[in-house]
């Protein structure tokens, strides 16, 4: 079969398969690129994972133990030890952290 005969006979199938491949690639790029919705916090002097859990676990809808386990796993902290100046990703969506930390100041008249 020549290319012309293959195209004439299977053009709908070829277009369908190519469309599926292109949409699949777009979907994979979108999902992989959009996975970083969690907040990153800087560890202060004297902070521990449990202190971060006390501060942020309520905003993540997780129990404190689950919060600490998640942070250890996602930040590759085998011993759970963090030092001042470290940045860790926490399971609190960026929008929740911004909303709760922001304040509104009214202008004086």
UniProtKB/Swiss-Prot annotation:
Q: Which UniProt keywords apply?
A: Cell cycle, Cell division, Cytoplasm, DNA damage, DNA repair, Septation, SOS response
> Which terms under GO biological process does the entry name?
division septum assembly; DNA repair; negative regulation of cell division; SOS response
Source organism superkingdom: Bacteria
Localization, per the record, is: Cytoplasm
Which parts of the sequence belong to the LysM domain?
39-90
Q: Name one GO cellular component term.
A: cytoplasm
Cell division recorded as keyword? yes
Q: What is its main location?
A: cytoplasm
Q: Quick check: keyword Zinc in the entry?
A: no
Q: Which family does it belong to?
A: Belongs to the YneA family.
HAMAP family in alphabetical order? YneA (MF_02014)
**Task of the protein:** Inhibits cell division during the SOS response. Affects a later stage of the cell division protein assembly, after the assembly of the Z ring, by probably suppressing recruitment of FtsL and/or DivIC to the division machinery.
Supply the name of the protein. Cell division suppressor protein YneA
Lineage here is: Bacteria, Bacillati, Bacillota, Bacilli, Bacillales
Which gene is transcribed and translated to give this protein? yneA
